Amino acid sequence: MTKNDFTIPAILMISLLTLAPLANAGCCSEGTWDPSGFLNSDAGTGMPSQPIQSAQAEGSQESAAVSSSSPQNPPDRLASYPNGIIMKPMKSVSSSDVIIDASNGDGYAASHIKNAIHIPSKDLLDGNGNIKGDVELSRLLGEAGLSREDSVVVYGSAESSGEAQLAFLVLRHLGQEDVMLLDGSLDDWKAAGLPVEAQETIIPAAEYIPTARPGVIAEYDYVKSGQARIVDVRPFVDFGKGRIPASTALDPANVIKGDKIKNGGDLGTVFSRLDKDMPIVVYSDDYSQSALVAYSLQLMGYEAAVYSWGDWQAHEGKGDDTDSKYVKLGKT
């Protein structure tokens, strides 16, 4: 065998060894073509490429994280509440929901969420500012087209107004299982590019059959019994003149930041001195204010009901002016 006889096979062998990695890169173990295998190989070496985390890539990820939590893309604040299921994100509202605009005044006629019906929160109260009876409330809701089986979303002129919270609590009291407060106002809805209209929405009347739920609207005997922690949300000057014995004062402004209910972390500070193992009754001479605080307590997992200062006066007179304590519950 000549020298050239050895040279040619050697050259062929070297060529095959060089091409083998590229062949394997495009094949799976059974010998069929695998595009991902080829794409994941390094064309220069035939070795699988390794992901390299560059400083620039890390910076891009950090920028994305900052962007996602920016004011334009706020994180889901509902997760900050232990009982956030009673608040509904705007983007989760669907055509199957009955939307109630509980705002007072003439704002509804100017603009409202598309297909929202108008039930002003003041219509839930009688001439003395007390919550109407169950029969009258059921008639009002039925005439508006609502049934107890509906999925309901309520909003008001602003979260700070207490309008939607009062409607929410009245519906819960009547046994409405699926009712939530909208996480945002009409202005927030518009800013999100969601549909609005000025035309009044009218839906066919329905039969509203209530099933009264205890523990939402408190009664005198329960408040008198001492089974609940009593929170007074009237102006402090009124608290000083007379109050329910052993009550604690709380300014409703402490649960609001801007025109929204504070997030769970801040509310936790506000309510830090309240025991979750004890029911709470929130009272005022303005149900929108007591409802605002009671709803905020419910968001944080407390069992909270509303009560009327007027009802207490009807039974007890002006109330005690000594056996009470003023506590500023966590201004944040």
Task: Give names to the regions the model predicted.
Residues 1-2, 22:
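Generic N-terminal leader/processing signal
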Residues 2-10:
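Bacterial N-terminal signal peptides that target proteins for export
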Residues 9-21:
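Bacterial N-terminal signal peptides
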Residues 23-332:
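Cytosolic catalytic domains that perform sulfur/thiol-centered chemistry
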